[in-house]
Amino acid sequence: MSKIIGIDLGTTNSAVAVLEGTESKIIANPEGNRTTPSVVSFKNGEIIVGDAAKRQAVTNPDTVISIKSKMGTSEKVSANGKEYTPQEISAMILQYLKGYAEDYLGEKVEKAVITVPAYFNDAQRQATKDAGKIAGLEVERIVNEPTAAALAYGMDKTDKDEKILVFDLGGGTFDVSILELGDGVFDVLATAGDNKLGGDDFDQKIIDFLVAEFKKENGIDLSQDKMALQRLKDAAEKAKKDLSGVTQTQISLPFITAGSAGPLHLEMSLSRAKFDDLTRDLVERTKTPVRQALSDAGLSLSEIDEVILVGGSTRIPAVVEAVKAETGKEPNKSVNPDEVVAMGAAIQGGVITGDVKDVVLLDVTPLSLGIETMGGVFTKLIDRNTTIPTSKSQVFSTAADNQPAVDIHVLQGERPMAADNKTLGRFQLTDIPAAPRGIPQIEVTFDIDKNGIVSVKAKDLGTQKEQHIVIKSNDGLSEEEIDRMMKDAEANAEADAKRKEEVDLKNEVDQAIFATEKTIKETEGKGFDTERDAAQSALDELKAAQESGNLDDMKAKLEALNEKAQALAVKMYEQAAAAQQAAQGAEGAQANDSANNDDVVDGEFTEK
């Protein structure tokens, strides 16, 4: 069975890992980095992903960041003169990860396990699967990020019984999961979180502070200047990282904008104390999900054996202190917060292929599922933190006499009223025989698969007629849209490959022209004019082809030049070899004469 890669598709950074033997290994990107920025840029028709895209974010307005925050919505992003769905942009990131994983493995990769925040709803999970499909990946499993982290942490501890709390603060989302590990079983007891809290929010607090201070001093609002804002974002992210290691950092942005008197510069120092003050409310928001998860799991703090930190934002000192204060435990530092999720995803890939044995992963659904019943009430069929996959049925009836049909309004959430929860979909069961209200028996069944994807069935127990849907949120993509996007992605891949081929050919032509001109100059007056003239003629023809830009002509003329240049090189080599031989012959004769003289002298010394 081919390898299944593990992908952590993050808000700010992504990572890819693969199982090698029993070890999960992070695959470095072409720039040698173990994580890749989740950034996509468009330039001159080319799609640029990762570090290169992030570097040009300041100057290139066609740059997309933090697309994960839009997954599962109908919101599109404009770039490159087009509109893209979040799934399409995410697919470009996935294609890039897939590409360098294939380069590392030396084989095609067609399957992946992709992680999502534990608190992702059905629409967001479906969007992630769709992105994988567009990227040419069969998504074998969608795994919750904290669960994947626990899997990576606990792989070498399958003989121990432990209860662990995973605190996962990423770039755009926050999750807390509590798991029980024992005899190779990873059982998720509870999960809680906040889909709108992450490292980006900490960056934003610094940006807001810098904008306010600059406006106070100069009367100019930098938030209205797109290029200045991007520079502020980069500076804020760097300052946040610096303050994890030092207590004060300098923010210096020369020529940030211009005033009536000329250019203006931003020079400010930011202390850790000030940063903590700016972000106090964000740190405070991490506490409620921790308490909620413990309550749902029915555990006290004293029953937690280990606390695992996941996500780059858990390096913020105030966050670490808050975790210590809330759990009463020193966090375990044995895992890399940036890499552990992708490593866990690769282990789950190994479980699927059978390369990892004696490991069972029991995940849960993060939010309750149910339907709207009379009076706009949300009636739950599956409670949050139910182990998946699962199935649950409940019998309902009609609300009016002779009601011919029932509308099934499928919802996800925790609020008591339907209007306050997330609509997953609607469908109708029709042709119900006329009967007084409360008589027809309508059985509604919810199924959640291993990926957390929901399907719902309604059945009239009297007529046995049923309706069945796999939930596709209004923001989801149709099969036709996914197919079109897959074709677009394939077409782009071909175009990118062709563009690279063109660049490689042009570079080869430049190199050949340079090398041949050098050789012709070096061989001037050395006697092989026929070969030199032939090489010069081929060189002139290649230069003309280069000028015209005709790729086929360039290819043909390059081959011709290589042939003539080779003939000239052979003559040069032959001449050099002959000269070397002649020189060695002269040295040999001289050595013989010298040896004869030495014999005479030695004879004199040996005479007694």
UniProtKB/Swiss-Prot annotation:
Domain of life of the organism encoding this protein: Bacteria
Pfam assignment, any one: HSP70
Induction of the gene: By stress conditions e.g. heat shock.
Compositionally biased residues, Acidic residues: 599-608
Disulfide pattern: none
Alphabetical list of CDD domains matching this protein: ASKHA_NBD_HSP70_DnaK-like
Record InterPro entries: ATPase_NBD (IPR043129), Chaperone_DnaK (IPR012725), Heat_shock_70_CS (IPR018181), HSP70_C_sf (IPR029048), HSP70_peptide-bd_sf (IPR029047), Hsp_70_fam (IPR013126)
Transmembrane stretches, start-end: none
Region annotation (Disordered) ranges: 578-608
Phosphothreonine PTM positions: T173
GO molecular function: ATP binding; ATP-dependent protein folding chaperone; unfolded protein binding
UniProt biased composition (Low complexity): 578-598
Alphabetized UniProt keyword annotations: ATP-binding, Chaperone, Nucleotide-binding, Phosphoprotein, Stress response
Keyword Nucleotide-binding: yes
SUPFAM superfamilies assigned: Actin-like ATPase domain (SSF53067), Heat shock protein 70kD (HSP70), C-terminal subdomain (SSF100934), Heat shock protein 70kD (HSP70), peptide-binding domain (SSF100920)
Statement: the UniProt record of this protein carries the keyword Nucleotide-binding: yes
Family, as annotated: Belongs to the heat shock protein 70 family.
Primary role: Acts as a chaperone.
Name recorded for this polypeptide: Chaperone protein DnaK
Organism of derivation: Streptococcus pyogenes serotype M2 (strain MGAS10270)
